[in-house]
Every structure is written in structure tokens, then in C-alpha cells.
Amino acid sequence: MSVVGFDVGNLSSYIAVARGGGIETMANEYSDRLTPSVVSFGEKSRTQGHAARSQAITNYKNTLSQFKRFIARRFSDPSVQKDAKVVPYKITQLPNGNVGMQVQYLGETETFTPEQIYAMILTKLKSTAEINLCRKVVDCVISVPQYYTDLERRGVIHAAEIAGLNCLRVISDTTAVALAYGIYKQDLPTPEEKPRNVVFVDCGHSSLQVSVCAFNKGKLKVLANASDKNLGGRDFDWLLAEHFAVDFQTRYKMDVKSNQRAWLRLMAECDKTKKLMSANATLISMNIECIMNDRDVSGKISRADFEALAAELLKRVEVPLKSVLEQTKLKPEDIHSIEIVGGSSRIPSIKETIKKVFKKECSTTLNQDEAVARGCALQCAILSPTFKVRDFTVTDLTPYPIELEWKGTEGEDGSMEVSSKNHQAPFSKMLTFYRKAPFELVARYADPNLPIPERRIGRFKINGVFPTTEGESSKIKVKVRVDGHGIFNVASASLIEKLPVQAEDAMEDGSPEENGPSKEEGSGASQAENDAPMDQSPVQGGAGEGEASADKEEQADNGSKETSKDSKDQTSESSKSDKESKDQNSEGSKSDNSSTETDAKAAKKTKKTIKTHELSITATTDELSITEVNNFFEKEGKLIAHDRLEKEKNDAKNAVEEYVYEMREKLCDKFEQYISEKERGSFSKLLEETENWLYEDGEDETKSVYQTKINSLKKIGDPVENRFKENLERPGAFEDFGKALVPYIKTLDLYSNGDEKYSHIEKEDMAKVEKCVKEKVAWRDSKVNAQNQKAPHQDPVVTAAQIRSEIQSMKFVCDPIINKPKPKPKEEPPKDNGPTPEEAAKDGGPAPPTTEGGEEKMDTSDQAPTGEASKEGETKPDETKPDVEMELD
């Protein structure tokens, strides 16, 4: 299972993967870890990344960038209208009121949604990751700006689905950076100690995001977020471009803003100038050739002048920095450090502004470009069951307050705040309503100053609601949740039904709750009809705590189910016992039958039970429907297939072109003597005709046509190339042949001279070796002589491969014979020294003679001796030998 994190930025994207015990940022086919977030469409194909960015000026109308700012946005949105004026492509309104992007593709006008374009970049990143990992990539984590709304986050998830990815988590940029920072820190305070407060500032291409996070060992908690979604590096580029546009108008009488291509070139040069000023305080020059009307322009600016121009922008930088301090009630001295990331954070004046607010130097311990992607990969590893990661809890927050609204049954509408700004996320809440019929909840952002015109999140209809048997309102429990993606949902709804009870139970059981609606519930019914929810159970804390608390809520409801079931079981057992008692009494006495039945009836009682009905929920949001997502997924698959075919066709065409140029050069150089004059002339003419065909009739042919063309050329060129290669390899092969003959010839000489080393080899076997060697020598000499008669441009008599094959066949015959091991000398059998003492004693014969050392044979059997043993080395003829001889050590 792959563990991949994608950071899709407004200008560029990065891929990080967890493997080898760490996090690695991946490079693309250009050996660059940065992939431009650009998609370009042409008459024949589409391109993404670096190839698309190269067409940003020449094909600007069909090259889409900065699409991230249009996801799930209305065309009428003021910020959309503002961005539409600065992008070079055409923005249109879709039938649903959202933004569409119009381009010319394959000769037709096509309109794509921002989600589709986002998916195209994800497709490119996915392909790069799969090439690096050599496996399929499905699960991933994707970063989004912290200010993204519910619909925008849903749009990113849909884009991942269109690209064939399973997005495990949508994580805020600054939260991902904080995770990448904190998980490797070994010096964080313990959970019991005061947390370490760190500020993260992400200044990217189009936005500024600030976050304050509290760190303890194994725990990260986001305290506050603030951002300016319209302040980034591109705003400084526009500032410089406006400055030079006025300068060129004054000095050259040239309006570069009237020409889109000239303006794009100026913007690109201003970006380079801005980066140079970040590293140099000297005067920076800018030169653009043929910017417009075949005229060159130049300009100069210093860092001081640039900072003076950007004074208003730098003031805006202070706003979110001060905002997070106000939200958290922290002082600058409470901040441990300030970590800056993002390409635009390299601007010196931005660093100075941050330093002025927090009264601390900025820290750059994180990789400013790759930190977000690395945090995403870490989050994916935490969520993946195949990776073991150090325990680290992440508690994020909701960027905007959320409220619920509903229509009252008696004309008065109701509302309540579900979560406040900076509420911990994910979280769940259980709400209680009293209704007789299905009803609808409307979720919206509560802040009227929200930077988006449409504050509604969605509508959620609770279906299947019915009144009680008494005609009163039923108790409805609704669970709302903001999940790990930061997306709001009505997770579940259930109706609590109280089943009716018998009159006897009402008399025996005095509990008002069991006998019917209590006073509180009775008043609650009317109160509910006036739209006051009767119960809400807020859940705070991290992901684990929120889930646990939500489960407790649900378990409380399920507990009532189990209690009811237990009481039913008890009632059933009681009834069964009474019945058995009744049967026994009826067997004993018929007269007691009526009395027993009366007792059983009195004992039989049914406690009031509670039954829970799960209710269906119909959610209506402005996100893409399932059908639309499936259609876009199929269309993306067709685009990928078309791109693959186009690439294969271009590769085949390039192969033909490359072969033509290569062979034309070699025919006059390396291959000159390996082809006849006549053949060289005809082949050169064919190569020239093929080149002309490529740029005329063959400019746009199918892959098979190009393959046929190159195969026809190789029929002529390959023999020439083979003759060249054989001429290089053949002398070495003959030399190896001669070296292989030497040991066999030497062995034959030694054998003929009677060398002891080979005396064990039979004459017939050595004759085989001699015959084989003579045949191979004759074959070599004949081939060498025949090859010497051939001209270089003629096909060779023998190839290097054939020579090596002959060497192997010779070794196959000769090696087993000459390497035959000499047999070992035969071992002599042991001499017979007569019977052992034990055998001699059995047979009653004389004892055997002594050994060479003068010692007699010993026997260590357990039989008791019958006499003294003779001394070692002495033999007395007249002395009788004992039955057993023993020698003690």
C-alpha cells in the first residue's frame, strides 16, 4: 500500500512519500521535485506540468493555471470576477451557476470545471508517484488552504475521485506543516507541562496563512488560524509589473497591458526580478527582447524602491499575524518560535514584518517548498494500517462558525450554533428534536462577514418521522458531525418510540417516565413545536475523543434497547414459569385451576419498552452529484488514453527522425567502409526522402505508419551496422579462441611425454581431445583465411557469436576429459592378528601373542578375574593364563 501526500499549490505542486523509514520528496521526469500546477490544451493533445508551463505564453488562451481559486465557487462571486480579469483564459458560467473554463481542444470548444482541471494535475502527480514507486497509487492525503469552505473541501475530494484516488484526509496547509514540524521533535514538553506555542506562517503564490499551534509530546493542537486569501507572491509580481508598465509607457510610448502576450512576459520577468531582489540589495536590471512590436525594453529597480511600492501590501501582512495573537490571547513572549514556509516568505520585507509583530527572528528549519507535502505524507502514514508511526494526535479546528436552522411547526423558526470559530475538529454533537412529521435542517456559516457570498452549507431532510400512538411529537435524536476533512454532515437520525403499557402496569409501577410522557416531555412537545431543541451533547477534543464521546451517546440509546430486550426476556421467562406452575396444579387438582390462572394473569406484566427507529437523511448540497463525478471520471479516463496514444505516436515519429539523422551522419563517418558506394548513394537518398516526408505528408500519421517506415529503413541500415560491430568484435573473438586452445595443446604434449599427472586418462579419451583440437584449429584457420578475402562492405564469413559458440563446444568435449580427477590409491585391508583374548578364553585355546608395544590384548568385560594379571611386557611359559586379562590405567 502506497503512502503518498500531494501538495497542490496555486503555482506549483509537490509529491512526498513515506518509505525507507522516512519521508522522501519525489522528482518528475525532468528530475525536478517541483511540478507546475498548469494544464495546457492543444489541437492534438493536452499536457500537464512543465510541458504545459512552456506553452503558457505561446498558447495562453488554452493554458489553465490558478484553477485552485475557482473550485466550488459561484461565477457571481466578487473574488471570482476579480481573478477572471487577471487570468489569460476565458471564464464562463456553468448551468448550475458555478465557474467553467473554456478552451480549444482537438479543434473543438470544451468547457471544463475547476474540479476536472484539479483532477488532471492529480493524474499527473499520481503518474509521477507510480513511476517512482513502481506500484499503483490509490490512497493519499491532499492539502488545502485553511480558509477553504465546506463546499471547496468537497470539491477537492471529488477531484481526487475523478483522478482515481482515494483521499484519506483533506488537511489544511498549516496543519500539515505543523505535523511535519512536531512529529520529529524530541524535546517537546510532556503532556503535564505547559505546551510549546509555535506560529507557522505560509506565504504562498496567492494567499497568506497563519496558524498558532500548541505542542506537547505526541500531541499537536491548533489554537487559532488567520489568513488573507488575496495576498501572496503574485500580488508583489503585479505591483512590479504595474510599475514597469508605467515606466515603459513613459520611456518607450508602449502599452504592454494592451497585449496579453507582452503582459505575460513582463509578469514572468517581474517574478525573476523579485527573486533576485530577495538575495541582493543592489540595483537589479531587467531586459526583455522583442516584448512588443519587435522592440526591446529594459528597466531597473532596487530593493528599497520595491519595499516602498509594497508598503500597503506589507501592512496587510500584519493583519493575520496580529489576529492569531488576539484570538489566542497570547503575548509575543509566549511564542516559542515562528516557522515560515512558502516561496513568498523569502521576501526580506515579509520576514521583517513578521519579526516586528512577534519580536522574534523567523526560523527556517523546515523546507519552505516541501514542508506541506511532507506533512501530508506523514498524515497518510498515520492513517495507513501498513505503516507503524510514532503516536501523534492532531487536533485541528473549524475556520468558521456553523449554525443550524429549521422551520417551526407553529410558524416560529429556530436556529442554534453548532460550532463556534476555532472549535476543535473533528467533533460530534447529539441534538434532540420533537416532531410529528419529517423536517428539514439547514446548515450555514454563522459569520455574516464571511469572505464568500454563499454561506449555506446544505439542507438535510430527516425522513420517516411519525407521531406517537397518542398523537404527540416523537423524540428525534440527530447526530451532527464535522469530520476529519473539515466537512459538516448530519451523520445519523433516530426516532425513539415508547411502546404503550397495560393499565395494570400503570397501577403497579408508579414511575411517571414509564407510565407515559413526563411533565418535562409533555411541555417539551409543545416546546419542540416551537423549535427549541431539547437536548444537545457537545463533544470536544481530538479525533479519538470525539469518536469516543459520540459512541457514548449512541451507546446510551442502544442501552435503552438492550434494557427493553432484557425486560421482554424476563417477562417471557416469568410467563413460562407461571405456565409450568399452572400445568402442575391442573394435574393435581381441577378445583385449583381457576385460582392458578388468576394468579398467573396477575403476575404477568409487561414493562414499558423503548424502540429506536433509524431514520434516513436526504442531504442536498451544491457539490457535484455522483452521476457527474462518474461522468467526469470516465471522461478523464478517455483523456488519459488519448494522451497515451498521442505520446506513443510522437515517440514513434521521433524515432524515425532520430534514425534518419543518426544514419546520415554515420554513413559518412563510422559506416563509410562498410557499405558500397552504390548502396550508400541509394540509402542516403532514401534517408533524405524520409526526412522530407516527415515534415510534409508524414507530419501527422498513425503510430503504425511510423513503425513501418523505420522498419523499412532498418532493413538497409541494420546490415551495415552489423558489419561495423562484427569488425570490432571478431578479432577479439579469434584471440579468445587461440587462448582457449593453448591449455588443450599443452595437455596433449604432457600426455605424450608420459607425464604422471595425466597417466590415469585412457588413450581413447585423450584421442578424442586430440581430434577435437585438430578440428577446431582447422576450422579457425579456414575461417580466418576466408574472412581475409572479404571486403569490409561485404557480409562476414563468420560472426563473433559463432566463434564463441565453437569455443564453448570445444570446452564441452575436452574439459570433462582433461579435468578428470586421478583415482585415489587403494587402501590395504587390516592384518589378522589371531583371536582376541575373549575368543581365546571361550575356545579354551592359548592366549594370543602380545602387541608390537609388548602389551597384551585387553578385555574390559564385567566378568570377575580368576587370577592375577601378568605384568605388562612379561610372559612366563609355565604360568597359566587367567580367564580375563585387565589393564588398569
UniProtKB/Swiss-Prot annotation:
Region of interest (Disordered), ranges: 504-622, 812-889
Name of the featured protein: 97 kDa heat shock protein
PANTHER family the record matches: HSC70CB, ISOFORM G, HSC70CB, ISOFORM G-RELATED
A single cellular component GO annotation: nucleus
Residue ranges of the TM segments: none
Pfam families linked to this entry: HSP70
One Gene Ontology MF term: ATP binding
Organism phylogeny: Eukaryota, Metazoa, Echinodermata, Eleutherozoa, Echinozoa
Protein's job: Cell surface recognition protein that binds acrosome-reacted sperm and thereby mediates binding and subsequent fusion of the sperm and egg.
Biased composition (Basic and acidic residues): 549-585, 869-889
Biological process terms in GO annotation: protein folding
Positions with biased composition (Polar residues): 586-597
Keywords: ATP-binding, Nucleotide-binding
SUPFAM superfamilies: Actin-like ATPase domain (SSF53067), Heat shock protein 70kD (HSP70), C-terminal subdomain (SSF100934), Heat shock protein 70kD (HSP70), peptide-binding domain (SSF100920)
Organism for this UniProt entry: Strongylocentrotus purpuratus
Family: Belongs to the heat shock protein 70 family.
PROSITE patterns the record matches: HSP70_3
